[in-house]
From Swiss-Prot:
Biological-process GO terms, alphabetical: ribosomal small subunit assembly
Protein name: GTPase Era
Recorded GO CC terms: cytosol; plasma membrane
Domain KH type-2: 215-292
Span list, region G1: 25-32
Family assignment from sequence similarity: Belongs to the TRAFAC class TrmE-Era-EngA-EngB-Septin-like GTPase superfamily. Era GTPase family.
Region annotation (G3) ranges: 72-75
Taxonomic lineage: Bacteria, Pseudomonadati, Pseudomonadota, Alphaproteobacteria, Hyphomicrobiales
Gene assigned in the entry: era
Protein's organism: Mesorhizobium japonicum (strain LMG 29417 / CECT 9101 / MAFF 303099)
Domain of life: Bacteria
Stretch list, region G2: 51-55
Subunit and partners: Monomer.
Its membrane topology: Peripheral membrane protein
Binding site for GTP: 25-32, 72-76, 134-137
Amino acid sequence: MERGMTDIETAETPATHSGFVALIGAPNAGKSTLVNQLVGAKVSIVTHKVQTTRAIVRGIATHDNAQIVFVDTPGIFKPKRRLDTAMVTTAWGGAKDADIVLLLIDAERGIRGDADAILERLKDVRQPMALILNKVDRVKHETLLALSAAANEKVPFKRTFMVSALTGSGCKDLLDYLAQALPAGPWYYPEDQISDLPMRQLAAEITREKLYLRLHQELPYSSHIETEKWEEKPDGSVRIDQTIYVERDSQKKIVLGHKGETIRAIGQAARMEIAGILEQKVHLFLFVKVRENWGDDPERYREMGLEFPH
């Protein structure tokens, strides 16, 4: 008996989808926590201090046949100084370049202040937009419905999602939507890559997180951390030297702490987390230097991935 042209039945491979999704919102709405939850790994630092995210951090999630590149932007607020202006400009730039824009609103805080101002400006955005209400586990259902209606009255959102960035509730529905809404096309990054942030920069971000968590009240966020040295050792360990730049001597004393206790605690917490990510032993050395008005130095902005506002 004659066979057909082939013994193997071929099924058409599903088309891959990929694209950039900008996550915008007011400071401390939970953007970084949500990106980490959606990616399934830590790609953005999280603290209780407002404006922790300074530059755009891309977290990469693979869901079904789609690669979703999340752009975690700085919180949008009314800028008061040069660094603030650079961060807000960066945030809107991230939204302008994205395929889809997600607005994250803290459901506990509702629409007021910065969130209301963002909604007004979103009226001029042409990309598809979706609304995400965060911390829904802490708010009554009737309040959530009223909040959703008020936001959708101002801006024509394609979809509204109710999530808890902390627990992950509602995140699968959001990923399902993004996977089918992004354009068909090849993936931008290898399948196992979860961020495009260089490891030297991520290590500095982790130390900055530990600094803020330890000194939440005492230290203003006008501090900056640079990874000055990264040396792979023959025994498989790595030596990392980082400098914490502050603007005044009084801030340096706070970071050092009594007999160096504070900086040791910060270093230990950062070293453990960096070692966990690298899966190798880490020798972390922290130094504190005063650099007055570093916030007016264009070179520092370039290192943070920000455009220096003139």
